[in-house]
Amino acid sequence: MLPGRLCLVPLLLALGVGSGGGSGDGGDSRRRRLLAAKVNKHKPWIETSYHGVITENNDTVILDPTIVALDKDAPVPFAGEICAFKIHGQELPFEAVVLNKTSGEGRLRAKSPIDCELQKEYTFIIQAYDCGAGPQEAAWKKSHKAVVHIQVKDVNEFAPTFKEPAYKAIVTEGKIYDSILQVEAIDEDCSPQYSQICNYEIVTTDVPFAIDRNGNIRNTEKLSYDKQRQYEILVTAYDCGQKPAAQDTLVQVDVKPVCKPGWQDWTKRIEYQPGSGSMPLFPGIHLETCDGAVSSLQVTAELQTNYIGKGCDRETYSEKSLQKLCGASSGIIDLLPSPSAATNWTAGLLVDSSEMIFKFDGRQGAKIPDGIVPKNLTDQFTITMWMKHGPSPGVRAEKETILCNSDKTEMNRHHYALYVHNCRLVFLLRKDFDQADTFRPAEFHWKLDQICDKEWHYYVINVEFPVVTLYMDGATYEPYLVTNDWPIHPSHIAMQLTVGACWQGGEVAKPRFAQFFHGSLASLTIRPGKMESQKVISCLQACKEGLDINSLESLGRGIKYHFNPSQSILVMEGDDIGNINQALQKVSYINSRQFPTAGVRRLRLSSKVQCFGEDVCISIPDVDAYIMVLQAIEPQITLQGTERFWRPAAQFESARGVTLFPDIKIISTFAKTEASGDLRATGTAPKSAVLEEMLHNLDFCDILVLGGDLDPRQECLELNHSELHQRHLDATNSTAGYSIYGVGSMSRYEQVLHHLRYRNWHPTSLETRRFQIKCSELNGRYTSNEFNLEVSVLHEVRVSDTEHVNHLIVQPPFLQSVYHPETRSSIQRSSVVPSIATVVIIISVCMLVFVVAMGVYRVRIAHQHFIQETEAAKEAEMDWDDSALTITVNPMEKHEGPGHGEDETEGEEEEEAEEGMSSSSSGSDDSEEEEEEGMGRVRHGQSGTSSQRPERSTWNTAGVINIWK
């Protein structure tokens, strides 16, 4: 049938054309429609629905099923072909294209890359169109409408981001939380796979926190406010494609303390700069009571310094200097001095040299030499000491002797002793029969906890027999037990005074020490015939550091306070917490030493609370802090002055002698670092040290004699005692030197040193003496340089004619005495620089040699030449006789003016010259008379005479030359 129909098409077309040839265009179109209707009988056919997938950022759509349109008019040209696929919808990003008109195959594609985040899926209508009856798109037939559903496939292009840049939470210490807070992140991808957050993670390590997949953060252990008050952790997030967050978020967790009663806002370490005065310790402290019903409060601040020196920071001057500083009476005897040549009995003891603390280990004792302490202490005397002692070893401990005066041999009697027995301090004093013959008090016992507390305490025993009083740390204690005894029978046995043990001279095969002391002692002294006052005792044991209160008048009402004697403990009481807080903020630390001991001072604050009608009251923990005393600036003490000078021998022999240090200066400096330089050029400030002068005290200056001790038979060092006393200093003198001691300013020591003199009764055998000065502050803690002085003696030397080997240097007898007048200032300069005198002497001798050489040829010419020389130098007159000639060359001696007797001398010289030239046989008598007459006017030595005078003037001369070295 189909081939038959195709055969009819040309026929029908021919008929249509023939029949309608004359009716116009309307007839033609009607005929074409009729023809098409007969040829394009069927509509294209497609599936009713399509499902497709397109990948994000791509244009290819994968459809299921594929687009294929069928037309039953095929294979008729145009009518059986598919010409187009059309999509119905507004602004759809897709288009459908025909791949093959005959087969009807098509393809759906995107006009531009698809963004899933804008739209995840699309639904639209599509229809297929055949080609109709011809190429003019006439009579196209379209298929039914098919539904196309396209889903956009997502790409994981976005990373998770947190909703908040930072999170903050507050937790209470001591609790475990299921969730402290929740962090949340989002992802802008469109698919569930890439847009959902599948995991959270804590980036910060070693923190007591964990996080779950939902972002909930919890703590894994109990948090402590005291251990750490804030935590900062970083958290990241992952989407289900395991892409991490672009930026981590910060989570800050603050730990809030559980309300605990106690002191708040105080600093554990407190630094103290030396010289800063009184420094507040708790400027911001306050008490947290947690709403407790507190009725009253007692606060105790304790400065713990028992491990420093002798219990606290005290002046480290020598015991003699401290006694002098505190105004103690003279006559103190130091039983534990620093080891030296004069005090060698402490050389074998264990000692802490920095503080002069002697340690006794139960095996040591020291014998005090005879004569150090008088045998009769009288009824009044004082014993002082620093002692540190612990519990006695053993159940029945034996006596531990501190000081003992016992028989040296034969017997074992104790005349007086101070010892510790079972933590009791006992003082024994046995009178002799010649002092008393009745039953008298002999042993005095004190029972104090401080004796065995292993801490330093200052003990003073004042004896005014029969009353004995103990002062410990400034407080007075009466003996709890006094036992009586008979006086000691008189004997001629010598006594032995010991420290650290008692000497057992009798009742044993060999005398030995016994009853050894275990502990530490310092500043053990005894003062016979005098009791010490309470003021001096307080001064000697006073601490230079302690607690203080700034502005006592500003303390709140109802505040009571109390200091212990050393100001190391302060107790404050009150019923108002606010007033207590203000009062405690005014508590300060002060150290009055210019050079305090550096180191730690522990500080404890304890509290006692009473509450209103409460069975259980709050408990306030102690505050443990410490004060760090920084190192003080160390001074550099420098001695300056003349290091060498010369003095005439007569001055050494005079009553006042020679002043050794007339211009000495004592200067103390310290190095101060300052920033300098060009900051713009270097970027940093270089530091330079600048010396600045500082003022402080000295405690001794030693003047040592170098090159051998002084010979007391012919030399000594002298110093007026008034110079010392008016400056509150003392001194000791020996053949080894002079020692000035006492706490005083550097200017006081300068003034005293300016008056120190050296005398020598026989300086003829002395050429030089050398001395050395060395000064100290704080008992040798800071010492000066060693200043050396050399003193030389200017001697008068006599030279006779027999000592001249070369007779050309002997002055001829016709030369008169020559003077070299100089002023006093020249003499003073020459005393310092003796080389000037030597130069003048050499020049004078050369002149004389020249004159003698000329005189050999012609006496007249020599005489005239000498006159010219003497006129030029304004010298003295000459004599022509053969008698002895005196020549004095002393450029350092003060002479009369150059014009004295000048005219008269010149006239006489001319007359004598004429007489000598006219007749050589005029006799020696006249010449001798003239010479004696001239020498009577100018004479500095003794002249001798010649028994015979040769024709050509043979000279025999005896001369004296005074030379100051």
Curated annotation (Swiss-Prot):
Output compositional bias ranges, type Acidic residues. 903-915
* PTM (free text): Proteolytically processed under normal cellular conditions. A primary zeta-cleavage generates a large extracellular (soluble) N-terminal domain (sAlc) and a short C-terminal transmembrane fragment (CTF1). A secondary cleavage catalyzed by gamma-secretase within the transmembrane domain releases the beta-Alc-gamma chain in the extracellular milieu and produces an intracellular fragment (AlcICD). This processing is strongly suppressed in the tripartite complex formed with APBA2 and APP, which seems to prevent the association with PSEN1.
Chain ranges sitting on the Extracellular side read: 21-835
Q: Where is the signal peptide?
A: 1-20
Q: Where are the transmembrane segments?
A: 836-856
Which part of the chain is the Cadherin domain?
46-162, 163-282
User: Which Pfam families does the protein's record reference?
Assistant: Cadherin, CLSTN_C
Q: Which residues lie on this side of the membrane: Cytoplasmic?
A: 857-965
Entry membrane topology: Single-pass type I membrane protein
Q: What is its main location?
A: membrane
**Which stretches does UniProt call biased (Polar residues)?**
942-959
Q: Which domain of life is it from?
A: Eukaryota
One GO molecular function term? calcium ion binding
Glycosylated positions are 58, 100, 344, 376, 720, 733
Q: Per its database record, what is this protein's job?
A: Postsynaptic adhesion molecule that binds to presynaptic neurexins to mediate synapse formation, and which is involved in learning and memory. Promotes synapse development by acting as a cell adhesion molecule at the postsynaptic membrane, which associates with neurexin-alpha at the presynaptic membrane.
Name the family. Belongs to the calsyntenin family.
Name-wise, this protein is Calsyntenin-2
